[in-house]
């Protein structure tokens, strides 16, 4: 009978577990970790000779890094167009700038930043596409319905709709395949210039200023230069427009004429003194002062009593509106000559009424001499007792005991200038049947007494009295 013993020491698990690892990954990793890293890829170091060692381990038939030549030994056209290969991969590029952008994908650097949202990108083209989000520019234009789009895919979907309706051709589809964002923007700018008659379109210029298409530089220095280049033409244009508007703008009348509410402050003292002197000279000539040689000197030679009685009647506006109570000295005034009844008339004195102060002193026609052709004007306190009173062309003797006297104000048109010329005046020619308004006062003088004296001394006509019988 055979005894079977288990093989405890010959298990395959224990043998495999005891073997040391001999995979090529560990060998490669251990060999690269011993050296100093020169490039950072993600979160682990990469040796500078990584690409060369990888190429050595690859198939020897793969010669991507070696330039391809033709039978004459010259490099092919594709290789001549892309002379800048990548050290980390088999990619080739036509410019050094494109190679640097490609290496950013290996290193993880993002040097291109958006000015609006501060987003960073590793490729410049990616930044260009991102900036379309912030701008309202729509450079892609449909050639059928002239609709504009921001993205090329949107225009392509729109063209498919026209193609289903048989509104487009294959030539337009081929043109759409070769269309890029830059070429679409240039084409739209040319179309706007043609519509405006060859002049640069203002809308396109405003769109370029407000919505820049592309930022091709990553440095701040070049960016500041581009900003200055954009701001310089606009600032010059605004300055020239302001100068042009300032030259064409007309002159306003308000700059020459002061406003209506502007109060002009004038010194009226000289005008007041002039008017006062004229008024005083007129009063002097009116009451006979001009005949006397002592009073021909003007305002300075007036009598002190007359100057003391004059008061200032000037109101706030500078015009004499209030009346003056002036006590005039006793002087003789030429009365009207009723002998010669001619057609001559008195010169009007109403023209001087505005410049003269109104005289409101009460006068009495008393003490009339029958042999003299003058009326004596006296003050109320110098009234005589039993004197005849002139009333409606006749004389009336009023008793001294009668306290009422017919007092009235002299009208300015009755006063004569100082030349003492006799003017014929007929009261009946002016007022035939109406008595003088300011001379007749039935309330103060008895009607019966007036009628009695009127019957005794009236003339045959009953209206006037001859000059010789006064």
Swiss-Prot record:
| Gene3D superfamilies named in the record | Classic Zinc Finger
Which tissues is this chain's protein expressed in?
Expressed in body wall muscle and gonad (at protein level).
Q: Which intervals of the chain are annotated as region Disordered? A: 1-25, 191-235
GO MF, any single term? chromatin insulator sequence binding
Gene null: resulting phenotype: RNAi-mediated knockdown causes paralysis and arrested elongation at the two-fold stage of embryonic development.
GO terms of biological process kind: regulation of striated muscle cell differentiation; regulation of transcription by RNA polymerase II
ZnF locations on chain (C2H2-type): 84-106, 112-134, 140-162
Does the record bear 4Fe-4S in its keywords?
A: no
Q: Where in the cell is it found?
A: Nucleus; Chromosome
Give the location of motif Nuclear localization signal in residue numbers: 221-230
Q: Name one GO cellular component term.
A: nucleus
Q: Which PROSITE patterns match?
A: ZINC_FINGER_C2H2_1 (PS00028), ZINC_FINGER_C2H2_2 (PS50157)
Assigned keywords, A-Z: Chromosome, Metal-binding, Nucleus, Repeat, Zinc, Zinc-finger
InterPro entries (UniProt xref): Znf_C2H2_sf, Znf_C2H2_type
The similarity annotation says:
Belongs to the krueppel C2H2-type zinc-finger protein family.
Briefly state the protein's biological role.
Probable transcription factor; required for proper organization of muscle myofilaments and for their recruitment to the M line.
Annotated protein name in UniProt = Zinc finger protein pat-9
Instruction: Name the gene for this chain.
Output: pat-9
């Amino acid at each position: 009978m055979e005894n079977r013993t288990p093989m405890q020491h010959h298990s395959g698990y224990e043998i495999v577990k005891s073997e040391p690892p001999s995979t090529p990954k560990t060998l490669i990793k251990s060999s690269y970790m011993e050296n100093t890293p020169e490039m950072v890829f993600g979160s682990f170091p990469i040796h500078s000779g990584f690409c060369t060692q990888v190429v050595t381990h690859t198939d020897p038939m793969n010669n991507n890094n070696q330039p391809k030549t033709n039978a004459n030994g010259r490099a092919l056209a594709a290789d001549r167009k892309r002379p800048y290969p990548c050290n980390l991969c088999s990619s080739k590029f036509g410019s050094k700038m494109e190679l640097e952008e490609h290496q950013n994908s290996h290193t993880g650097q993002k040097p291109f930043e958006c000015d609006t949202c501060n987003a960073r990108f590793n490729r410049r083209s990616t930044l260009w596409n991102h900036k379309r989000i912030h701008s309202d520019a729509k450079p892609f234009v449909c050639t059928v319905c002239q609709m504009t789009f921001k993205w090329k895919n949107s225009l392509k979907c729109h063209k498919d709709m026209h193609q289903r309706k048989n509104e487009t051709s294959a030539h337009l589809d081929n043109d759409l395949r070769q269309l890029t964002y830059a070429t679409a923007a240039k084409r739209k700018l040319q179309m706007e210039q043609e519509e405006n008659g060859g002049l640069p379109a203002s809308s396109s210029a405003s769109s370029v200023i407000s919505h820049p298409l592309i930022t091709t530089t990553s440095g701040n220095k070049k960016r500041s230069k581009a900003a200055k280049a954009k701001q310089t033409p606009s600032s010059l244009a605004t300055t020239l427009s302001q100068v042009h508007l300032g030259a064409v703008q007309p002159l306003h009348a308000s700059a020459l004429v002061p406003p209506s509410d502007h109060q002009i402050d004038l010194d009226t003292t000289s005008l007041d003194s002039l008017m006062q002197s004229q008024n005083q000279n007129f009063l002097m000539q009116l009451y006979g002062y001009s005949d006397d040689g002592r009073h021909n000197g003007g305002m300075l030679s007036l009598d002190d009593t007359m100057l003391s009685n004059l008061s200032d009647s000037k109101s706030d506006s500078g015009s004499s509106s209030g009346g003056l109570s002036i006590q005039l000295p006793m002087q003789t005034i030429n009365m009207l000559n009723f002998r010669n009844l001619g057609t001559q008339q008195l010169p009007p004195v109403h023209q001087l009424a505005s410049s003269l102060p109104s005289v409101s002193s009460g006068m009495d026609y008393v003490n009339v001499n029958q042999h003299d052709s003058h009326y004596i004007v006296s003050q109320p306190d110098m009234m005589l007792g039993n004197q005849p009173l002139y009333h409606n062309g006749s004389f009336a003797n009023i008793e001294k005991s009668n306290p009422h006297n017919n007092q009235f104000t002299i009208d300015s048109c009755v006063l004569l200038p100082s030349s003492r010329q006799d003017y014929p005046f007929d009261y009946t020619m002016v007022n035939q049947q109406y008595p003088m308004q300011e001379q007749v006062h039935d309330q103060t003088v008895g009607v019966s007494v007036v009628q009695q004296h009127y019957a005794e001394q009236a003339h045959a006509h009953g209206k006037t009295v001859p000059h010789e019988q006064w």
